[in-house]
Amino acid sequence: MSISISDSAAQRVSAFLNHRGKGLGLRLGVRTSGCSGMAYVLEFVDEINDDDIVFEDKGVKVIIDGKSMVYLDGTELDFVKEGLNEGFKFNNPNVSNECGCGESFNV
């Protein structure tokens, strides 16, 4: 099982945590949503739960709840800028289908 984070994503998460002034890392999860069934969830973590799986890459802790891990195993979290838009991108090898807008996926 693995989760990785790109250099640009690590820099962005570190900057957000520093600006926020607290936090242990970033929680990455999935929830039921959208036309393809699942959507990614990102949130800052102040506490790690007993069933959480913690990965550390490039100095950033990425926390995954046990239920989401099956959908996220092997995912790389990236931060990209495309024109005037910027945001986190999930390079997930488990995805079999995405909706047209790219907001939800299926495995």
From Swiss-Prot:
Pfam families: Fe-S_biosyn (PF01521)
Residue positions binding Fe cation: 35, 99, 101
Record keywords: Iron, Metal-binding
Taxonomic superkingdom: Bacteria
GO annotation, biological process: iron-sulfur cluster assembly
HAMAP family xrefs: Fe_S_insert_IscA (MF_01429)
Function, as annotated: Is able to transfer iron-sulfur clusters to apo-ferredoxin. Multiple cycles of [2Fe2S] cluster formation and transfer are observed, suggesting that IscA acts catalytically. Recruits intracellular free iron so as to provide iron for the assembly of transient iron-sulfur cluster in IscU in the presence of IscS, L-cysteine and the thioredoxin reductase system TrxA/TrxB.
Protein name: Iron-binding protein IscA
Gene: iscA
